[in-house]
Amino acid sequence: MLLNDIEEILEENGYSYCEYNGCFDIAARRESIMLLKVLNNVDSFQEEQANNLKMLSNDLDAKPILVGLNTRREALSDNIIYDRFSIPTVSPKTLENIIHGSLPTILRFRGGMFAEIDPARLKSAREDVGLSQSDLAEKVGITKKSVYEHESKKLKIVYKNAVRMEKTLKTDLMIPLELKMSYAAKIKPRSIFEGKISQNFRRMGFATDFVYQSPFNMIAKEKSFMLISDVDEKKNRIQKNLPYISEFSHVTKKSAIVVTNEEIICDIPTLREDELPGLKSRDIRKLLKRW
């Protein structure tokens, strides 16, 4: 099973991790946090899942990665980064290489193969062999303007043109790709209750974001302090998520709190909605320190 294979890779490389079947399947942490969605067919990953994964990753400063075996049309090749709704998408072997510090140099995007080259290295190598920008452009089959732009800043270049440049200049120019994603649009609270809780936390000085397909649905941040929270009127819904919230909090080293309308006994700090209006941010911090 693919999920087990990925967890084995994580264990062998010293990661602590937990599972949740939502916008991510594995939250893993060593020096930093990775949020992994694991699917045999990566085309089954939906845009709503991607938006929630982006929001969660932005707030946690985590790396979101979609790991799979194939699309509907082809198998995923190793050492190539694919793209699905702006989430870096890789094969299991590529993930293992990334964990070992070996980042791919090829991006598959919208049917094309792209790379990035080092601008300073390109200019230096061109000058070392005595070629003008026009000379190099002619040999590679691109425009002089394109050579100028690639010497000025990092830009995507068609992979085959990057290979031609390296062959012409007899040096390595391609650089490892960063695991980038686009920023997520704000996700609105889905209920009046969630909106009221968010309003109370904002009054205390917290910035709040909502995220779904996750064991919790609200993230609250104040300066360098951050907490994850499951906010729901019904405690039976929260009780289903408690083990996942606890594990996620332990793995990511983020404080967790539960907010509901009813009394609930659990291993996570809890607050009732009617307690919030009289609280300040320092009260929240004190509550979390006691746990």
Language-model segments: residues:
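Helix-turn-helix/homeodomain-like alpha-helical modules used for DNA recognition
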Residues: L2-D5, N13-I26, L177-P243
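DNA major-groove recognition helix of helix-turn-helix/homeodomain DNA-binding modules
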Residues: L155-I175
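Recognition helix of helix-turn-helix/homeodomain-like DNA-binding domains
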Residues: G141-K156
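Conserved hydrophobic/aromatic packing and binding residues within compact polymer-binding modules
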Residues: L122, L136-A137, V147-H150
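A short, Lys/Arg-rich alpha-helix, primarily the initiator
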Residues: P104-E127
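Catalytic cores of nucleic-acid endonucleases
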Residues: L39-V90, P215, V231-E275
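The alpha-helix within a helix-turn-helix
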Residues: Y82, R126, A137, E166
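Short alpha-helical DNA-recognition segment
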Residues: G130-K145
